[in-house]
Amino acid sequence: MDIITLNLVRYKYSADTTLGKLYLNDNILCYTLEDAVRPYGIKIKGQTAIFENPNGYNIGIKHSNRFKRDMLCLYTEEDKVTIKQGGVSFSYVYFHGGNTHINTEGCPLVASNVDEDNFRIYNTYEAPLFKLVKKYMEDGYIVKVKITNLPYVDKN
């Protein structure tokens, strides 16, 4: 099976929030907002971005009881809802809408617009991303997301 890889590139960090851009090939699809990036193997439940993973996480479609709809779920394990990385695990990591780190609980938020100064995103991109990934899956592709942390740059 052929593989389609989305690339999530994290580029701006604060104490509680991480901004990124999600690409397909070299084209930006949307902006992302996640909880704080922590050292590999360190997790604070609901306040930690999933770890950088150059090999990529699998993306599947899973029904969310919380959100009451099918959503894109990231995973590494056979149960298709669990990520095991760095000696810790994350479960039910969905791409979804939201505006700030308060909305993430460890999930990547996706949106069309970003306010970098205030670490906010807006105009959710959840539905277009779901539609795109679902179409690739229906066409027989395996879809993954590779996550890269760019170095922190202090502009002060």
Positions of predicted regions on the chain:
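Cell wall/extracellular polymer interaction/catalysis modules
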Residues: 1-143, 149-156
